[in-house]
Amino acid sequence: MPTPKAFTLLGPTACGKTALALKIAETLPVEIISLDSALLYTGMDIGTAKPSASERAFVPHHLIDIITPVQTYSAARFVEDCTRLTGEITARGKCPLIVGGTMMYFRALTQGLNDLPEADACLRADLDEQKQMYGLDFLYRTLQKVDPETACRLKPNDSQRIGRALEVYYLTGRPMSAHLNGQPEHTLPFELYTAALIPEDRARLHENIALRFHLMLEQGFIGEVENLRRRYPGLTADSPAIRCVGYRQAWEHLDGATDRQTFIEKGIAATRQLAKRQLTWLRKTPLDCVADPFSDGTSGTRLIEAAKRFFGE
């Protein structure tokens, strides 16, 4: 049996990945595998710009609406699900198309997973108690002592990752940086073609981000977050689902921490920061094909032709 193939379309938020994926679907018999951690959650449709019902009816989508906002998902599970789906889609005679911008998942898929321990509920509760008693700064200073390399690359207010790094250290006796630096060689079980949309006009991307954020507000984004608060009492501002861009800022606004205008400004700024991080990842990622979505209108055609050649169509 021939080795399965998958075509990956990467890019920062608001650069037109979904629209291009649908154009590819008009040309090739694809099924889309979402590479977007925000699309995993049910009930989070507006703020994630989730593909519409008609778009999902036009072409099958996978790894969308598979967990609730109080459940968790990991890079390890993504690798497992993506590998399984690639085989299943290929067996159906279709072409797997991986689309998104969660670069941590893509890195796990292409470079392999580290042998890190599973989350430990008791230890996590202990760390949460320390944070409540002494503050997040105390945990960050502790991390600086036991794993300065990881502490250096994390922001002092990144509660989730600081807690995870300390958890790894306490469970294994080794800093997370040592685990990451000792990563073994990794081989993908399928052939992968990696294309990316990388806009050179940063101002145009920022304009798209602002326009999309305002459109989300018109579509009822605040109401969506209010519904999440009612439906899932266990959700907090630190929950992984609420850490998705826009949701954290909306949550703070509904808590009364910001007025509407400040919320909008912070939401747009957070989305711009996400795009900046995604572009930084992409510039470090080996790519088979790069196109500027805002150039001359031919970038989409070039990527569609690249996909057709890759799949032998």
From Swiss-Prot:
Enzyme class: transferase
Record: residues binding substrate: 13-18
Cofactor names: Mg(2+)
GO molecular function: ATP binding; tRNA dimethylallyltransferase activity
Positions bound to ATP: 11-18
EC number(s) stated in the UniProt entry for this protein: 2.5.1.75
SUPFAM superfamilies given in the database record: P-loop containing nucleoside triphosphate hydrolases
Pfam name, any one: IPPT
Record field: catalytic activity: adenosine(37) in tRNA + dimethylallyl diphosphate = N(6)-dimethylallyladenosine(37) in tRNA + diphosphate
Keyword Transcription included in the entry's annotation: no
Keywords attached to this entry: ATP-binding, Magnesium, Nucleotide-binding, Transferase, tRNA processing
Chain positions covered by the region annotation Interaction with substrate tRNA: 36-39, 160-164, 243-248
GO biological process, one term: tRNA modification
Site (Interaction with substrate tRNA): residue numbering on this chain: 102, 124
Record bears the keyword ATP-binding: yes
Quaternary data: Monomer.
Membership in a protein family: Belongs to the IPP transferase family.
Function: Catalyzes the transfer of a dimethylallyl group onto the adenine at position 37 in tRNAs that read codons beginning with uridine, leading to the formation of N6-(dimethylallyl)adenosine (i(6)A).
Protein name, UniProt field: tRNA dimethylallyltransferase
Organism: Neisseria gonorrhoeae (strain ATCC 700825 / FA 1090)
